[in-house]
Amino acid sequence: MGGVKSKPKELGQRSRSLDDGTGGHHHHTPNPTSFTPNRSPPVEGSRRGTQPNIINAEQALFGGVNSTTNSITSPNRIGILGGVTTFVALYDYESRTASDLSFRKGERLQIVNNTEGDWWLARSLTTGESGYIPSNYVAPSDSIQAEEWYFGKITRRDSERLLLNLENRRGTFLVRESETTKGAYCLSVLDYDNVKGLNVKHYKIRKLDSGGFYITSRTQFSTLQQLVNHYRQHADGLCHSLTDVCPVLKPPTQGLARDAWEIPRDSLRLDVKLGQGCFGEVWMGTWNGTTRVAIKTLKPGTMSPEAFLQEAQVMKKLRHEKLVQLYAVVSEEPIYIVTEYMGQGSLLDFLKGDMGKMLRLPQLVDMASQIASGMAYVERMNYVHRDLRAANILVGDNLVCKVADFGLARLIEDNEYTARQGAKFPIKWTAPEAALYGRFTIKSDVWSFGILLTELTTKGRVPYPGMVNREVLDQVERGYRMPCPAECPDSLHELMLTCWRKEPEERPTFEYLQGFLEDYFTSTEPQYQPGENL
């Protein structure tokens, strides 16, 4: 780890007294490997906290971080009504249409009109040119949101995902809002020692009534900027002095551009065929000659264009960093569905491929927690997926997982599918009340999530091996449940069994599943040791 020294004993004791105000709060990921979720490798552009010219096309253009949930990188919105008219660019942006405005990180912009939601009309104070800009790419000048180290409403778990990257050195840091104390902040710092390896320490930044800030009351600062600068110069009780700002990729824009929803077919180019299913194909493509996207083409007759367009209006409002973002549609047959592009394809193919062989339980559980996070949002929005399985989860670089194809299953008009029997219907993933009586709810999605956990722990094996669909339905009705997969801890199999309870209301919520999986290696399996496969 590049000259890491053991910290002195007294420093360790002082650190424990400072951390989170309660003592030594840190999170350790067992057996850290190169699989550090939520980071993607370089492609183009720039990322906050590093030198320019490093960005991932998938995340930059289609990363799914949103304004309706905790966002990794979006600044808090501040309107121009209060006299704040000058904003600063947080990232580079290349225009995608004639009405867009290109700008560079650090450029100052005057907001002309911010009443149109996700895209604001702005004028560059550098070039004098005007055009539309993505509102989540700018922050008010001289505000905390404009600081490279300020990550806003990022969760504790996401801060750890970002910091626990093997490219980061000891002392890499970020500042975020406290999840537990309103108005307070948290300083998250990457640490390393020979016993725990890489781990993240979290220090609560408390606010004085007079407006100042402190981690320990003997050292107080009038601004957060002064606090950060102080701990850059001296560890002063922290696990390490602050070194680098945590790198983060550009967030996605909300939509492809202003007013780009129902788009002409000729604005899309199908570049590389990625897959084919019962109802259509999936392509990597390009929109408007500028923007990489994924395009799902549906066979004519698969669903009613009118019903699809109505459902798509709901689907496009679902915005969460763990849901694949719906960007645009071609609403005449053959229907095209345009979404963000995920570079590693479906989770099922990923698990069965070369990368799958290298995955161990910490990475698999982290992927499961990301899926549960996306589904917890679906749960909060009172929506239902209806077809949750590894084939409908997409993987980005560095094990970012996102839920795809939510809500589409309801619209399929194929007789063999709607009868819930035959090869086209995913019986093995479907809860009995949904398969037998068509009762699809978020609780039938929870059942499917339990099946998905078996796909993860068996690296993509088909559920109920050796059994045909009809047999599965009969056996499950009689109380049969799949046994614990090889090397899978009993505690994880017990979680699967709770997802497969006969009575839907007795199954856990996705909110519970997310919390259980995020804390799995601290609360449930702290003694985990890697095995041959898991």
UniProtKB/Swiss-Prot annotation:
<comment type="similarity">
    <text>Belongs to the protein kinase superfamily. Tyr protein kinase family. SRC subfamily.</text>
</comment>
<feature type="modified residue" description="Phosphotyrosine; by FAK2">
    <location>
        <position position="417"/>
    </location>
</feature>
<keyword id="KW-0449">Lipoprotein</keyword>
<keyword id="KW-0829">Tyrosine-protein kinase</keyword>
<feature type="binding site">
    <location>
        <begin position="274"/>
        <end position="282"/>
    </location>
    <ligand>
        <name>ATP</name>
    </ligand>
</feature>
<dbReference type="InterPro" id="IPR036028">
    <property type="entry name" value="SH3-like_dom_sf"/>
</dbReference>
<feature type="modified residue" description="S-nitrosocysteine">
    <location>
        <position position="499"/>
    </location>
</feature>
<keyword id="KW-0963">Cytoplasm</keyword>
<keyword id="KW-0702">S-nitrosylation</keyword>
<keyword id="KW-0519">Myristate</keyword>
<keyword id="KW-0067">ATP-binding</keyword>
<dbReference type="GO" id="GO:0001878">
    <property type="term" value="P:response to yeast"/>
</dbReference>
<dbReference type="GO" id="GO:0030054">
    <property type="term" value="C:cell junction"/>
</dbReference>
<dbReference type="InterPro" id="IPR050198">
    <property type="entry name" value="Non-receptor_tyrosine_kinases"/>
</dbReference>
<dbReference type="GO" id="GO:0005911">
    <property type="term" value="C:cell-cell junction"/>
</dbReference>
<keyword id="KW-0597">Phosphoprotein</keyword>
<dbReference type="GO" id="GO:0007155">
    <property type="term" value="P:cell adhesion"/>
</dbReference>
<dbReference type="GO" id="GO:0005925">
    <property type="term" value="C:focal adhesion"/>
</dbReference>
<dbReference type="Pfam" id="PF00017">
    <property type="entry name" value="SH2"/>
</dbReference>
<keyword id="KW-0472">Membrane</keyword>
<keyword id="KW-0130">Cell adhesion</keyword>
<keyword id="KW-0539">Nucleus</keyword>
<feature type="modified residue" description="Phosphoserine">
    <location>
        <position position="17"/>
    </location>
</feature>
<feature type="modified residue" description="Phosphotyrosine; by autocatalysis">
    <location>
        <position position="417"/>
    </location>
</feature>
<dbReference type="InterPro" id="IPR001452">
    <property type="entry name" value="SH3_domain"/>
</dbReference>
<feature type="domain" description="Protein kinase">
    <location>
        <begin position="268"/>
        <end position="521"/>
    </location>
</feature>
<feature type="active site" description="Proton acceptor">
    <location>
        <position position="387"/>
    </location>
</feature>
<keyword id="KW-0418">Kinase</keyword>
<dbReference type="GO" id="GO:0005856">
    <property type="term" value="C:cytoskeleton"/>
</dbReference>
<feature type="domain" description="SH2">
    <location>
        <begin position="149"/>
        <end position="253"/>
    </location>
</feature>
<feature type="domain" description="SH3">
    <location>
        <begin position="82"/>
        <end position="143"/>
    </location>
</feature>
<dbReference type="GO" id="GO:2001243">
    <property type="term" value="P:negative regulation of intrinsic apoptotic signaling pathway"/>
</dbReference>
<comment type="function">
    <text>Non-receptor protein tyrosine kinase which is activated following engagement of many different classes of cellular receptors including immune response receptors, integrins and other adhesion receptors, receptor protein tyrosine kinases, G protein-coupled receptors as well as cytokine receptors. Participates in signaling pathways that control a diverse spectrum of biological activities including gene transcription, immune response, cell adhesion, cell cycle progression, apoptosis, migration, and transformation.</text>
</comment>
<dbReference type="GO" id="GO:0043114">
    <property type="term" value="P:regulation of vascular permeability"/>
</dbReference>
<protein>
    <recommendedName>
        <fullName>Proto-oncogene tyrosine-protein kinase Src</fullName>
        <ecNumber>2.7.10.2</ecNumber>
    </recommendedName>
</protein>
<keyword id="KW-0727">SH2 domain</keyword>
<feature type="modified residue" description="Phosphoserine">
    <location>
        <position position="67"/>
    </location>
</feature>
<dbReference type="GO" id="GO:0030154">
    <property type="term" value="P:cell differentiation"/>
</dbReference>
<feature type="modified residue" description="Phosphoserine; by CDK5">
    <location>
        <position position="74"/>
    </location>
</feature>
<dbReference type="GO" id="GO:0048471">
    <property type="term" value="C:perinuclear region of cytoplasm"/>
</dbReference>
<feature type="compositionally biased region" description="Basic and acidic residues">
    <location>
        <begin position="7"/>
        <end position="23"/>
    </location>
</feature>
<keyword id="KW-0808">Transferase</keyword>
